């Protein structure tokens, strides 16, 4: 439960129809095993104490009493288990029979939630035996305990207030307006569904989509435990299809006929963060009763997959689709700005590196979209002290293959003159030596744009903006920054995608060589013709910084939790021991706070994903905010050795 992680399981034990004693033993055995694995929330199927396929036997008092006897046995067994447990049973109350979910923890029966929607079509005829649940919550006596009974019940963990449980039963999810919708608006972050959904052709896909979509709509975790082996096969077959989803993502699944156990960790903090930032999610808890319970805090071992590249889809087909969409968004943003400004040219400083390559590719797409010749793109290369033959050659080949206008301005003499003006000793390779070149390049681009009636296209990416890896009023400044919403890890894939669809072998080869070139600003003199200044040696690996950036901005997680996630995401990577992850996380926070002043005056640029740093849009932060709290939390992280 540390960091908001809740280990949860959806379980479908084998059972015998109407044999409550046998079924109870199976449930208790699986519950104990789950507790041994650290599970804190265990959900069993609808009518798991009796079996769903009892038919008119549900009307027999013997079966009803057998279910209550089984419930008492589970309550007794649960006293020594630190697990919130949900089981399904028929319950006679108010003189009517209800299809109920019993919620229990440590021997206490927390509540009984009746099913709202009773299917009475096709193979289902629940209205023959059962009555729909009422929204009115009242207290009844069950197993010698006074228990709240009704559909408007929520269950909150005292030790982890972000874990609030809501309950629905099978058909409730399949209805037009599921009870879980109201549960979520009332504060439930985790919805459980006790189900007995029979298997038919195509139903598993539909069921999976329902669970994923409902978890996305409600910004919640969703556990679905369905009846499996042992149910009567007189007219139906039950496959034990168990699912756990979180905000639209399927985290765990027991496929039909695969054994009936789905288990993973839900991130309740993440769900809270999603709801906090979504102002359309309006809380409404009218009529609800919340029951509190206690669990012993535990540090769950993470088994859920943590994506080391959260900005980049893992599936090749989906990644290609995402790349094409982003390129179209960038191009459309630039096309609109060129049109609005009546710009005759799009002026881009070309270095032979990744970012300027992507900006050039986007500018070419924009001109084609506007029906204008690609020669209206003016690429300017500005070699100086650190420029290598490799990057210079790649810049020229790229421009030639894309059929854009190309010019070279050697800025060495201008920089020499500038250094003489300000008294800079050229043997001192300090920040003035580096930034002076960047600012001269920006001067050349701005004036070239004025001369040609054009617009300067910025090349800096989201990762550089987060780290402040840009010269203030140098490459930091442009008239429209097309890459401002694109993180470095994604820049690589966008360029690779363009290489994959390249019209000529020459274009593909130069793009691949650019991808293979170390990331560098080339502001220090080259050594033996090779790049002497490699960005990732100085500020750290971009795949780490993009990972940190995602969780800092997207969910507002603290350093300790992000460090924990990074350890899980990069486990097995020898180049990333804990000390390295910690070093660059600390570096990220220090730079992120210290460099906000650059982000406070960014040029316009298109948002392409959920994370962006525009001071006019998604990220508003004072330039003089202190990082002390975040750095202090980092100091508390224990490191081995």
Question: Model-predicted segments: where are they?
Answer:
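ATP/NTP-dependent adenylation/nucleotidyl-transfer catalytic domains that generate, transfer
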Residues: 7, 161-163, 220, 232, ...
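Enzyme catalytic cores with a strong preference for nitrogen-chemistry domains
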Residues: 1-347, 365-374, 401, 406
């Amino acid at each position: 439960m540390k960091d908001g992680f809740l280990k949860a399981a959806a379980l479908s034990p084998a059972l015998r129809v109407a044999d409550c004693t046998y079924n109870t033993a199976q449930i208790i055995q699986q519950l104990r095993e789950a507790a041994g694995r650290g599970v804190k929330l265990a959900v069993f199927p609808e009518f798991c104490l009796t079996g769903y396929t009892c038919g008119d036997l549900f009307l027999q008092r013997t079966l009803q009493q057998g279910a209550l006897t089984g419930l008492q046995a589970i309550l007794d067994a649960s006293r020594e288990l630190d697990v919130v447990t949900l089981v399904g049973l028929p319950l006679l109350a108010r003189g009517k029979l209800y299809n109920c979910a019993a919620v229990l923890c440590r021997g206490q029966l927390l509540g009984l939630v009746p099913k709202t929607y009773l299917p009475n079509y096709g193979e289902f005829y629940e209205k023959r035996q059962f009555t729909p649940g009422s929204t009115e919550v009242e207290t009844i006596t069950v197993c010698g305990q006074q228990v709240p009974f009704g559909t408007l019940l929520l269950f909150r963990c005292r030790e982890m207030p972000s874990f609030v449980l809501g309950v629905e039963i099978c058909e409730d999810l399949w209805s037009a307006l599921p009870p879980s919708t109201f549960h979520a608006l009332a504060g439930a972050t985790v919805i459980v569904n006790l189900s007995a959904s029979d298997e038919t052709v195509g139903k598993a896909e539909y069921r999976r989509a329902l669970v994923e979509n409902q978890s996305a709509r409600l910004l919640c975790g969703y556990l679905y435990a369905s009846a499996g082996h042992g149910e009567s096969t007189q007219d139906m077959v039950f496959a034990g299809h168990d699912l756990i989803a979180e905000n639209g993502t399927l985290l765990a699944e027991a496929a039909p006929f695969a054994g009936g156990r789905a288990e993973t960790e839900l991130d309740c903090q993440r769900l809270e963060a999603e709801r906090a930032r979504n102002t359309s999610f309006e809380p409404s808890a009218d009529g609800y009763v919340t029951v509190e319970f206690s669990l012993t805090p535990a540090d769950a071992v993470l088994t859920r997959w943590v994506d080391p590249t959260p900005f980049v889809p893992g599936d090749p087909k989906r990644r290609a689709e995402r790349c094409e969409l982003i390129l179209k968004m960038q191009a459309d943003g630039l096309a609109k700005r060129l049109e609005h400004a009546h710009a005759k040219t799009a002026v881009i400083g070309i270095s032979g590196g990744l970012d300027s390559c992507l900006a050039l590719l986007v500018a070419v797409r924009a001109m084609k979209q506007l029906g204008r010749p690609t020669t209206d793109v003016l690429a300017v290369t500005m070699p100086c002290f650190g420029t290598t033959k490799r990057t210079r050659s790649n810049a020229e080949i790229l421009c030639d293959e894309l059929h854009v206008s190309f010019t070279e301005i050697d800025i060495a003499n201008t920089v020499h003159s500038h250094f003489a003006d300000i008294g800079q000793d050229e043997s001192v390779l300090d920040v003035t030596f580096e930034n002076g070149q960047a600012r001269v390049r920006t001067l050349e681009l701005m004036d070239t744009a004025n001369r040609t009636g054009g617009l300067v296209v910025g090349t800096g990416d989201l990762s550089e903006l987060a780290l402040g890896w840009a010269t203030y009023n140098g490459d930091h400044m442009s008239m429209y920054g097309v890459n401002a919403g694109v993180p470095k890890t994604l820049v690589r894939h966008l360029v690779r995608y363009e290489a994959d669809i390249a019209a000529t072998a020459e274009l593909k080869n130069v793009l691949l060589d650019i991808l293979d070139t170390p990331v560098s600003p080339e502001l220090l003199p080259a050594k033996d013709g090779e790049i002497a200044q490699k960005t990732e040696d100085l500020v750290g690996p971009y795949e780490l910084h993009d990972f940190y950036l995602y969780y800092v901005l997207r969910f507002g997680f603290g350093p300790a939790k992000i460090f924990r996630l990074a350890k899980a995401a990069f486990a097995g990577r020898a180049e990333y021991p804990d000390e390295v992850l910690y070093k660059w996380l600390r570096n990220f926070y220090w730079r992120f706070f210290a460099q906000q002043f650059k982000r406070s005056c960014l040029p316009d640029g298109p948002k392409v994903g959920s994370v962006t740093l525009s001071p006019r849009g998604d990220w508003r932060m004072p330039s003089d905010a202190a990082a002390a709290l975040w750095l202090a939390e980092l100091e508390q992280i224990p490191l081995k050795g």
